[in-house]
Amino acid sequence: MVVGMKKGKLYLKRMISIVLLFSLPLAYNICTQFRFDADTQRLEAYYLEEPNSIDVVLLGASDVYSGYSPSYAYDKYKYTSYNYSIALNSVDLYAAQLKEILSTQSPDLILIEISSVFGTDKETEESVLITKHRMIDAVPESQNRKELIDSFTTLEDKISCYFPFFMYHGVSNMCETNINKISFSNTHQNLLKGVYIGVADYIWDDDFCSIQGVKTATEPSKECMKKINNLLKICDDENINVVFTRFPHRMTKAKLERFQYGNFLKGYLQKLGYGFLDFEATVEKNFDYYKDFTDGEHLNGVGQRKLTEQIGKILTENYGIKKRKLPEKCKKDWECSAEYTKLFYKYYDSIRETPNDELKKIYGEKHLWENKELIDALKQYNEE
């Protein structure tokens, strides 16, 4: 009898161990099922927009979502827009992203930033892998999503799309982050339309390089031009009204070659009849390296407002972009977003009254983007 009880306890312990062995990874996988960062929030929120309500979509990498504010543009110029942009984005994924853009919207114009074209082969390979995962984490189930998953070359990458534990097991705060996401995503309304800016500025002046008057144009690699021509064919086949752009960057000697590539591509695209908005060639005239940039690649909240106003003015005056008639609820949502964005910039400006060296100590390289922490901070700031 005693022996039987011991065996029973042993079997029970083994059963519990087996259950825990499978249930704990499963529970962790559920908690990491939906990665929540600024990129995921921005892309997921795109599908919350009223279908066929967006006038302009911007496609690009981190310099786009840190340089342009859709709700600020709405407040100033009354057209609707959205940043379908991802950190480390690559032109290799633009075809899939254009499909996603057109799956719910019929924009009058798509503005494509060209910086994602100029990465090295190694940089492109790494950025495609990372960006593809970010897209898959955010986009709804569709044939396009399935094709993205199928395009991975390794079994591990394919499996990680269904079991994110394999992709994010090294991210220690993922569970807590996604628990916050679950409660936040069920209540927020995409108030800031994917806006993103750094708190402190990290600017060094030892390697500045003036580009005023530099017109040298260097042809990119054959592979790069092939990707550009493939993109143009897609835009032509889909009858997409596309304009290209080059956002401002803090120019250094190391980036001069990229600038010269951009000069070539600008001339190439203009000869083919495409519009091209070049904000980099005039960066020294229209932007201040010390006051408008958070680092070498990205504008801060001051520069973001400057560039948004410049883009809005050009699109409305030169490209015929004007507000479309929106359903009443959609119009109220955009007006609400514009008001929240005003509050957001007030909050940002109040933080920036602290000297930059102190901001670095307090915030490090922290960024402001639409999450529960920021929305709560804005509400508290508004009440003070």
Question: Where are the predicted features?
Answer:
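Loop/turn elements at helix/coil->beta-strand transitions in domains of secreted/extracellular proteins
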Residues: S53-D55, K78-T80, S106-L109, D236-V243, ...
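Extended hydrophobic/aromatic segments used for targeting, binding, or gating
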Residues: E223, N229-E238, V242-E297, G301
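N-terminal Lys/Arg-rich, disordered targeting/topogenic segments
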Residues: M1-L10
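Hydrophobic membrane-insertion alpha-helices, especially the h-region
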Residues: L12-T32
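Histidine-centered active-site loop/cap adjacent to the catalytic His
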Residues: F293-D333
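Membrane-embedded segments
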Residues: L59, D63-L148
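Alpha-helical transmembrane signal-anchor/signal-peptide segments
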Residues: Q33-S53
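Secreted/periplasmic serine-hydrolase-like ester/acetyl group-modifying domain
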Residues: S127-E238, L326-E383
